[in-house]
Amino acid sequence: MRNFVALSALALIGAAPPSPDAKLRAIIVPVSQAQLRHTIETLVSFGTRHTLSSQTDPKRGIGAALNWAESEFGRYSAACGNCLTVARTSETFSGDRLPTPTKITDVFAIQRGTERPNDVVIIQGHIDSRVTDPMNATSDAPGANDDGSGTAAVLEAARVLSKHKFPGTIVYATLMGEEQGLYGGKTLANYAKAQGWNVVAVLNNDIIGNSCGSDGVCDSTHARVLSEGPRSQGEADLAAQTHSLGGENDSPSRNISRFLDGLADRLKIGLDVRQIWRTDRFSRGGDHIPFLQLGFPAARISVAVENYNWQHQDLRTEKGIRYGDTIDHVDFAYLAKMTKLNVAALASIASAPPPPEPKVEGAVSTDTTVTWNQGDAAARSYKVWRRRTDANRWEMAQTVRRTECPEPKQVMDPAAYAPGKDGSVTVSVLALQACKLVLRHIRVDDWVFGVSSVSKDGFESPVASAVPGGAFHPYIAPEKK
């Protein structure tokens, strides 16, 4: 027996480390239906969470709900040695559904990255609720699914992931004011911009808990991910380039959708992603849109089939049909799967270096040249992806190790100087050189190309497409000569 134990120990020492997907499967195990139910039960207990309801009543209204969410974040932070920074950000708005200036407050927790604290991935859900009349701030509006389910996913993600450390930063956000005009999304997007965050992805969870539609159709095996095609921020400048070079289906948000689709397939949790190629549902909107308007990659995650009898409805029964967004309509097994997908995505994106910024050349040539920046030292390799122009998913990739990229080059930088007796002295700095891959006998016309970054542990970023506006940072128009 002693020899067997010793041999087993030696085998473990020499064993390969778990794959990234194996790590993600282990991370999502603690996601709890019971905890998700507890969160929604508590949210429902506040009666209404309408944006215009009381912000000071300790038991009823939006203020009580925000205070409770803040206390939950605080509790999770205490359990992980104060690993979360719990914060609020507020702005005052007025509009069609805000007849008087109203303070909009988002409550969120920041889990700062150990290596790249400015690279940020955000999960968010709106905590406010409503009934039929969007201005009715007094009637009970349980909002169990819209958007108690998304808020529950945010809090559960914080509970589960705060037990781990990640190179990048994760932000868990509960937003106020969505039903009155996406004001919570605007507030947090403005905060992210003011902080100078490099927002890699925003996962907006809105209505993720019901599995049966108002027509009786049920589907607990799919999640819809909605994403914009051409990026909205910078659209006026990018339109002519996109018309010539393509990219209608390759915004950063669309590549987040592809990333989630592939992740769901690999996790094997009984949930498949159905990519919806729209910014949001037909003639509707969500809190990811203000992020898109500022140039941050964002997508909406939602149920496969909506039930319109259960959202934005007064609590009532008519002709034998029950209306209202009550907790008995939530499918908690389905909500747990949706939450696991989010948790895995957050962990994966926070573990990977941010996507590079690729460019492609190959006009009037039988070969294609793909180049990209190698700005993040955490990237140990890159994958150069391609797919046919009419294909949805990335089809094939070639790996380029960072050691195959050019070494940093010493260059003279007039902007950097050391003061001397005779004035400023120009000094040299190390400048990173672009990586390059030449694809022989691959015609640029027939393919879309992209590049992802891979960490030393094998975690891969979403793919950034080599198209106009394909980079994962806000678009900056070139200076006109």
Residues covered by each model-derived region:
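A non-catalytic alpha/beta surface segment that caps or lines the substrate-entry region
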Residues: I27, Q35-R112
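Active-site-adjacent mobile loop/cap segments within catalytic or ligand-binding domains
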Residues: V44, I208-G229, Q275-P353
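Alpha-helical metal-binding/catalytic segments enriched in His/Glu/Asp
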Residues: A109, I123, I127-S129, D133-L182, ...
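Metal-dependent peptidase/peptidase-like ectodomains
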Residues: L175-I289, L294, A298
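Conserved aromatic anchor
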Residues: T366-A379, L439
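Solvent-exposed loop/turn segments flanking beta-strands in beta-repeat/beta-sandwich domains
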Residues: Q374-E395, A415, V448
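Beta-strand-rich modules
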Residues: E407, D413, L439-E460
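Extracellular fibronectin type III
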Residues: V454-K481
